[in-house]
Amino acid sequence: MRVTHLSLTDFRNYGTAEVHFEAGANLFVGRNGQGKTNLVESLGYLSALGSHRVSSDQAMIRQGAELAVVRARIQHEARELLVEVQLNRGAANRAQVNRAAIKPRELPRYFSSVLFAPEDLALVRGEPGVRRRFLDQLLIQRNPRLSAVIAEYERVLKQRNTLLKSARASRFREDQLGTLDIWDDRLLTLGAELINARLDLMARLSNPLVAAYRSVAGDDHHPRLLPQLTISGAHVEDEDDDSVADMTSAFGDTTDVFRQALAGVRWKELERGLTLVGPHRDDVLFELNGLPAKGYASHGESWSFALALKLASAELLRRESVTGDPVLILDDVFAELDWARRRMLATTVAGYEQVLITAAVYEDVPAELAAHTIRIEAGAIVEPS
């Protein structure tokens, strides 16, 4: 899979932009603040349904405009698609494929990309919510149906929290507790599906992560992903490397465990007016050489871990997708690497059908990734060099 053309209207600092892409490596060069990251952010949005920089879509609409449009022409072998999303200030977003309307959450069915940016260091050093979003975005790319599951879980969670607060205020009336049981059943069904999907994903990422870390760092530091589930009260720490492939069974039947966990915290939840266990509060422990990467890994090791996670994601998508490789996006990555690691990364990504790279300094990028270079100046596309 690759992008052949990108059109932007009122997206970030671009009033309009038309960009042609080649197969293989495409390098965007420009000083900081010129708009090169905005270009790749727009493509990342099409597959992740969100920005890697901001939580609100509104920030991506150009100041003074009411809507922004991202339109990309996608090619897979002989098949060509026109994929479009419209971001609206005062209404729901809209999406199209070949001019036919679709739900925005269906976009990952048609375009797949993996983006790595400096902000991804937060995967290792940031809060649990960052790691949950990483897993869920990858889940949706692998199976877009899960977008609806996640959205429905969040809706049910919100309703349940509202009911818990109401029950607390009315001193736990019997009729409200009965209604809570109904919401519990829905929360259990959706939550167990999401937990199991995350566990399966972590298991599948295990081997690609080890290989990717070695390819970008040259070290055998054995990175691992260990689930920390609030419904279990503990996380798996089995020293057997193969145990990651059987994470789900380590917790027993997820729905039953979740049900028992909810029962165990029922009165605490009523006192606090908050759902205390479930996938919305889970975390993933990133481990390097048997130690938590957060707090123990150096800056370079943390950077390598985050980059390896994204490369492992790309490898997993390329193995499973019938549409070929995801488009690999490396946003301002090479500036953080020494020359040896730049060479290693260039070798690692060389086999992908298309790689999009941004850099402030042309010389930071190995020559084999700079054959098709586009310069960006003040939100304007300069002819390829």
UniProtKB/Swiss-Prot annotation:
Localization terms from the record: Cytoplasm
This protein's record includes keyword Oxidoreductase: no
KW DNA repair (keyword) present: yes
UniProt-annotated binding residues for ATP: G30, R31, N32, G33, Q34, G35, K36, T37
InterPro entries membership: DNA-binding_RecF, DNA-binding_RecF_CS, P-loop_NTPase, RecF/RecN/SMC_N, RecF_2
Entry's Gene Ontology molecular function annotations: ATP binding; single-stranded DNA binding
Gene Ontology CC: cytoplasm
Keywords (A to Z) from UniProt: ATP-binding, Cytoplasm, DNA damage, DNA repair, DNA replication, DNA-binding, Nucleotide-binding, SOS response
Biological processes annotated in GO: DNA replication; DNA synthesis involved in DNA repair; double-strand break repair; SOS response
Protein role: The RecF protein is involved in DNA metabolism; it is required for DNA replication and normal SOS inducibility. RecF binds preferentially to single-stranded, linear DNA. It also seems to bind ATP.
UniProt family annotation: Belongs to the RecF family.
HAMAP family: RecF (MF_00365)
Protein name per UniProt: DNA replication and repair protein RecF
Originating species: Leifsonia xyli subsp. xyli (strain CTCB07)
